[in-house]
Design a protein with these regions (language model features):
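Core dinuclear metal-dependent hydrolase active-site scaffold
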Residues: 1-14, 64-127, 142, 186-190
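Active-site neighborhood of phospho(di)ester-bond hydrolases with catalytic His/Asp-centered motifs
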Residues: 1-3, 16-27, 45-48, 112-115, ...
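Active-site metal-binding motif and surrounding structural segment of the metallo-beta-lactamase
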Residues: 5-52, 63, 127-133
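Short alpha-helical
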Residues: 51-52, 118-121, 167
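Binuclear metal-ion centers of metallo-dependent hydrolases, dominated by the metallo-beta-lactamase
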Residues: 57-74, 148, 152-190
Length: 190
């Protein structure tokens, strides 16, 4: 999901079977990275706004999904969940309908990746999520308090805060409490 940065970062993983892109911003969508890692067998899922900006050579590999739509590819059911801002001062960052969060169902498990979103009703309404990747990164998404409040509502079994640079992940974990198992990872080693 959202491969950005040097293509060398992805080399150890081989050619991806499936790539999902959540939004048009450079920390989610990098044309050069996609051109380097996407090969003939790779399935790419994006919102329409990303597909419109994709290089011509990649457009034929892309399946677009609008909010609320789903598709099955490679045995994975992929549901496009809205991701957007609610706060008036943040509406310019992520307007409703442009980007996607995703729920992927495979091997009997449901995994949610929020994309850049605030504490929206569509996220709170999610059910039976085994693992969730929830963002928190002001001014673009949520505070740790907002993210924890949402997680306490939809109760994924496990939650990984991601896209959190500068946010207090320890505070997030404390606020989630026993509603979900919080697993902290250092996504920013470099």
């Amino acid at each position: 999901v959202d491969p950005v940065g040097s293509a060398a970062l992805f080399k150890p993983y081989g050619v991806p079977d499936l790539v999902l892109v959540t939004d048009i911003h450079g920390d989610h969508f990098n044309k050069g990275t996609l051109e380097a890692i996407v090969k003939n067998k790779t399935v790419v899922i994006t919102p329409e706004a990303v597909a419109a900006l994709a290089p011509e050579g990649l457009k034929k590999r892309i399946t677009t999904l609008a909010n609320g739509k789903s598709v099955e590819k490679l045995g994975v059911k992929i549901e496009a969940v809205p991701m957007y801002n609610l706060t008036a001062a943040r509406l310019r960052f992520h307007n409703k309908g442009r980007g996607n969060g995703y729920v992927m169902t495979f091997g009997g498990k449901r995994v949610y990746v929020s994309g850049d979103t605030e504490d929206i009703p569509e996220m709170r309404a999610l059910k039976k999520i085994d693992a969730a990747f929830v963002c928190m990164n002001l001014p673009y998404t949520m505070t740790p308090e907002q993210a924890a409040d949402a997680v306490r509502e939809f109760k994924p079994k496990v939650v990984y805060p991601y896209h959190y640079r500068g946010s207090d992940t320890a505070q997030f974990k404390k606020l989630v409490g026993d509603a979900s198992e919080v697993r902290l990872r250092d996504w920013y080693k470099n």
